[in-house]
């Protein structure tokens, strides 16, 4: 018979059983429904009683195979027999039927969702508790609902949906990892239990993140699910199970629940993943072979979970019939997708009417349950089940339930938040972006932009020089908006400063966008209105500023270099002026000497002087002129006597210093001499050795080389290579003292000129901070100084002994460090006796002598010295300021423009 009523099959059944009008009776015994949902009913008996469900589509090629008899039939009364599907179980689905419930008045305390979905028996200490408050806070059943892992992220639910065309991301993602707990590779297959009708929008599905809220599903573990085993009796992982709502449910912000229209059908999709090849199901009676898998769909009431709401399905002729369980095939390691369409609730929820325009506080809700079963010998065993959040089922959709103006505005998941799924326009009715504001906007905080490198690709550094050129081409103008445009756009301040979009488009096209036509207040239409992206221009400014910083740094470096050169030029100018004044003084002194030493025959010069002073003699008497001449002659005589006295004193001082020469002239076998003549020049003092010289540490390589053989000791038949360095040094000293006694006035004038305040500011320290032998890290310090000669005031002499076990092929590297960038000149070097006499060694010596550096500059100066092949050697280095002195500079500028260093190396054979 055809079902035409709203309660349809169930109502007919209760009328047939004499229970008319008791559908809503709380005392109704629901054992028959419980038996149908949870017990292992007899499929054969149902097949003999129930007709097949006709296909609901004109094309039944995609219709799922239906279970004959295992459905909600249009039942007819039978005499003395309770239909098998409605036997009541009190245990698990695999257990035999037990006694039915005695009463339903206490369903709030002891309830059970049959078919193996919920088992919520309360006790004295454990009352029924609601589900997770974040999902469905009004469900009155105490069941555990752990989050099912989703395709996107485990535990995350898809956003709610309101549009019918919105589906889940699994529809387009190719069944990506639906169940992340199992990582076995799998393929995907899909089947559909419906053919889309003309108004179906299954072909226009959108990604989930662009949709409205979607109905949430959660697994229910109130009754233990049965496990699957393979042919080897190995337990398989839990079945991956996921239910997705395709369409038919709209979220109502006012009711804070999803609403389904009874006359409109809804559609759901189930994704099932089995791991391995299931052959057996584990029951309380042991292992049972699996014959087939089935899907069941039914509804339940939130306030009375024992009451089952039948689900109907529209047929091809627009009629409705009870939905039959769907027979499905599950392949190993594959995702099976089953789509159930054209479904309807057979009833509506109670208390749907509003009170004073507000939701009814006594509103009742349904929940939708989808279960997966394994069948064996007409018995069903629950494998997995999902239950939805609360649903309101209404008979129609009058205007009192939904306000069109609030259709897009919803409450967000975060407290005190409102969400709008669509475009928002302020002072405009045609927003073309997510938010369009015509008018001023105040932002007290900051505007954030996505900038994470993980969300970017093709990252390339821009040319800041090009950005600077583009910014230089942009024109900044002042302008006034037209009144009709300002009024239409909500602009209060018409006069502004900015850029012209057309000009910016020629320079930086990506910073200009067309936003369509804009209508002004007077009706004028501006076609293809241009707007400027100031963020792009701001980034161009950042690049231009970086380029300007580079240019500024380069200019600062060049300015610093120019300042250094200017200081050097000023220093040279002062030096040249001082030299010119000194030369003038020397010419005056020479001319005065020539006048005093000239004979009477050279009277012509006196006439010239008379002519020169002719103008003054007319004004001055003769005695004044004679007095001046006598005074000048007396001064010159005094200067000459002073010079002679200083010269004599210097000779005496030199005689005192000659006996105190360093022990380098000793001709004994203990310490070598530079020349035989040097020892004969002072036979009485050659053996004199100061105690300090004996305590000076030797230059030895015994720590890095074996010290077994003695080199260059004793010296026999040494070849004279050059004059003694000490003798030559004493000769230079005598020459310098002679020059100093003759030109004392010049040196005094020079030091006075250099002691001025201008020169003191540019003073350069030309002394050496440290000296060492690099190979052995031997420091040459003040203990090597020859105090008898000079060790300070611009002249330093070092007497350095070398160990007798030092090989002749050892390299001596002298490291000189200065505190300022200076130039070190090697003015002279003198080599003593050679430590070998073969021609081969002599050739090597000659080639070694040819290699000589002339100067180094900087802070660190390294000189390679030929010390080892000789019994003694002397080196003269001059440390000078740049561009102020060299080897030819007057020695009296020592300590001012340069500092001289003399190093005397000799082998100590004692």
From Swiss-Prot:
Transmembrane segments annotated in the record for this chain: 628-648
Biased composition (Polar residues): 663-682
Region annotation Disordered: where it falls in the sequence: 189-208, 661-682
Intracellular or extracellular location(s): Membrane
SUPFAM superfamilies noted in UniProt: p53-like transcription factors
One Pfam family linked to the record: Peptidase_S74
Domain Peptidase S74 span(s) in chain numbering: 451-559
InterPro entries, A to Z: MRF-like, MYRF_C2, MYRF_ICA, NDT80_DNA-bd_dom, NDT80_DNA-bd_dom_sf, p53-like_TF_DNA-bd_sf, S74_ICA
Name of the protein: Myelin regulatory factor-like protein
Organism: Homo sapiens
Gene name for this UniProt entry: MYRFL
